[in-house]
A protein has these predicted regions:
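Conserved small/polar residues in nucleotide/adenosyl-binding loops
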Residues: 239-246
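Active-site glycine- and acidic-residue-rich loops that bind
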Residues: 187, 214-220
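N-terminal pre-domain/capping segments
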Residues: 21-139
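Active-site acidic/histidine proton-transfer and metal-coordination neighborhood
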Residues: 92, 99, 110-207
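A short alpha/beta connector and helix-capping loop motif
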Residues: 220-238
Length: 250
């Protein structure tokens, strides 16, 4: 049986002040871990508010001991994170000595919504989602996936949709972003999907979380994107994949 280790580390660029002591001149590294990396372990624990599986708190404690200072969640479902209410999840993470920084979650548009351009029902879902993330102490909500649209019109609709989500996040003191994989570098009606998204979303409402591995896997240069679109990448994700392992979307 092959054991597969996937590590996604969220580098909290410009998110947390760097602490420097005048006496030692040592810089404190602020690095958050994406909990999707340990999903197989977390998914086995049985958490309920009022009763918490000891294995769950042990995992958080071990991550903190390894040097991680914050977490990015990836399990928002029915108003909870890992079967814990937003406030309880925040308490769990902080009790382990880390901060709740971000969360991967999204709601894609249906064929009907894309055809009509009316995504008001999805926005109702987002209203509750944003409220739950705010209660959990999140600073960022990041959409981790969208399929390649069939038409440029559909991609334009998604950009408008993301702008509206981002606007609503801003109103609640959060920021909304998008996390890439490699498929965003495909073309839609002659235009690179990722570039189109960067150019048709409002920087005031939408930032991008660059996954360096997937940019390179998509045969592009992360540095080129940083230079071409300054200020759009607020956080950076580093995905680790061993050479002998097959690609998985992380």
């Amino acid at each position: 049986m092959k054991t597969r280790i996937c590590l996604c580390v969220l580098a909290a660029l410009l998110m947390i002040p760097v602490a420097v002591t005048a006496q030692t001149k040592k810089t404190k590294k602020e690095v958050a871990i994406q909990l999707y990396s340990v999903r197989d372990i977390l998914n086995r624990v049985d958490n309920k508010d009022g009763k918490c599986d000891p294995a769950y708190t042990a995992i958080l404690a071990k991550l903190a001991k390894m040097g991680y200072t914050g977490v990015e969640a990836a399990n928002y479902n029915n108003g909870k994170f890992y079967d814990r209410t937003p406030r309880q999840f925040k308490k769990d993470v902080e009790s382990a000595g880390m901060k709740v920084l971000s969360s991967h979650c999204t709601r894609g548009l249906s064929k009907e919504e894309l055809a009509s351009g009316d995504y008001s029902k999805s926005l109702e879902w987002w209203n509750q989602c944003i409220a739950d993330h705010k209660a959990a102490g999140m600073k960022y909500i990041v959409a981790p996936w969208m399929d390649v649209p069939k038409t440029l019109k559909d991609l334009e609709t998604y950009c408008a949709y993301y702008n509206e989500i981002g606007k609503r996040c801003n109103q609640q003191g959060l920021r909304f972003g998008y996390h890439n994989h490699a498929h965003e570098f495909q073309k839609v009606e002659g235009q690179v999907m990722y570039d189109y998204m960067l150019e048709h979303t409002n920087p005031e409402y939408v930032f991008f979380q660059m996954d360096v591995y997937w940019v390179v896997r998509g045969q592009n240069s992360p540095v080129d994107y940083f230079n071409k679109y300054p200020g759009r990448f607020k956080t950076v994700s580093y995905t680790h994949l061993r050479a002998h392992e097959t690609d998985q979307y992380l």
